[in-house]
């Protein structure tokens, strides 16, 4: 089992990020869904529990060709999907990913907390002494170059983008966190991964953590660079955008079946 806390620093207020995160999740889901692969939203509704209340979502990720060949070799094509259940009681959020095929052999949990600070809270998740010893910490600076140059887009580079609506940016690499002219917040994302599969555990767990680093980096660069698209939106505006996106995703996932039918 691996436990890693990713700390993502952003030039936003915690309330601004609430809107920006939801908008960007919906937009990226739409961008990454086509021809039967991508995100299927089954449920998106309010929930209420004794400890938390917020928005509950249930999604299916149809992965298909998006996984490396060595992982696809482990499981049949019918099992190339992940089930995600998320409880967004902002500023606390919990996401659980499961593989219907792997069952109890695969555990993937993300717990997110958000604070108006500059990466200074050392145990925001209230971990035990044992958990703290097992946890590693990785700070993500959205201005640092992404690992794979092929994935670089100037329109998603915070050092190139200025938000006219928010009057922020472009961000100067590394030095922007010292600015007193912008708000500073941190997303503290605690990721727990366990893959109980003899001979592959270490490789898969490290692979998943690497994927999360890349996803968190890319996503939060987008959140900032799309500021002028979502800045000023209300929660009602975001929920309407999510609803429209849900319908669009359904159509895109149906494209593969329609294409197959046309080929017969």
Swiss-Prot record:
Write the lineage as a comma-separated list.
Eukaryota, Amoebozoa, Evosea, Eumycetozoa, Dictyostelia
Task: Cite the entry's keywords alphabetically.
Answer: Coiled coil, Cytoplasm, Golgi apparatus, Lipid-binding, Phosphoprotein, Transport
Location within or outside the cell? Cytoplasm; Golgi apparatus
Family assignment from sequence similarity: Belongs to the PtdIns transfer protein family. PI transfer class I subfamily.
Q: What are the cysteine partners in each disulfide bond?
A: none
Example GO CC term: the record gives:
Golgi apparatus
Coiled-coil zones: 238-264
**Top-rank taxon, per record:** Eukaryota
Q: Which Gene3D superfamilies match?
A: 3.30.530.20
Protein modification: Phosphorylated in response to activation of rasG.
Classification via CDD domains: SRPBCC_PITPNA-B_like
The record's section on PANTHER family has: PHOSPHATIDYLINOSITOL TRANSFER PROTEIN, VIBRATOR, ISOFORM B
A GO MF label:
phosphatidylcholine transporter activity
Q: What is its main location?
A: cytoplasm
Which Pfam families would you find in this protein's record?
IP_trans (PF02121)
Q: Which organism does this sequence originate in? A: Dictyostelium discoideum (Social amoeba)
Q: What does the record give as the function of this protein?
A: Catalyzes the transfer of PtdIns and phosphatidylcholine between membranes.
Key word Thylakoid present in the record?
Answer: no
Keyword Cytoplasm set for record: yes
Q: What is this protein called?
A: Phosphatidylinositol transfer protein 1
Region (Disordered) location: 151-174
């Amino acid at each position: 089992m691996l436990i890693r806390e990713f700390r993502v620093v952003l030039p936003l207020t915690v309330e601004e990020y609430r809107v920006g995160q939801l908008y960007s999740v919906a937009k990226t889901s739409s961008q990454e869904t086509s021809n039967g692969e991508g995100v299927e939203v089954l449920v998106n509704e309010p929930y209420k529990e004794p400890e938390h209340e917020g928005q509950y979502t249930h999604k299916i990720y149809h992965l298909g060709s998006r996984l490396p060949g060595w992982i696809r070799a482990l499981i049949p094509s019918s099992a190339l999907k992940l089930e995600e259940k998320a409880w967004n009681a902002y500023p606390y959020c919990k996401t659980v990913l499961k593989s219907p095929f792997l069952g109890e052999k695969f555990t993937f949990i993300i717990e997110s907390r958000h604070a108006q600070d500059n990466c200074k809270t050392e145990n925001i998740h209230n971990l035990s002494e044992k958990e703290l010893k097992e946890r590693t910490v990785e700070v993500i600076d959205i201005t640092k170059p992404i690992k794979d140059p092929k994935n670089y887009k100037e329109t998603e580079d915070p050092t190139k983008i200025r938000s006219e609506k928010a009057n922020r940016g472009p961000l100067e690499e590394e030095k922007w966190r010292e600015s007193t002219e912008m708000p500073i917040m941190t997303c503290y994302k605690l990721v727990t991964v366990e893959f109980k599969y003899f001979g592959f555990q270490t490789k898969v767990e490290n692979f998943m953590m690497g994927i999360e680093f890349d996803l968190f980096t890319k996503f939060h660069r987008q959140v900032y660079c799309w500021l002028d698209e979502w800045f000023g939106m209300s929660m009602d505006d975001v929920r309407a955008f999510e609803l429209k996106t849900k319908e669009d995703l359904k159509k895109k996932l149906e494209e593969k079946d329609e294409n197959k039918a046309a080929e017969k």
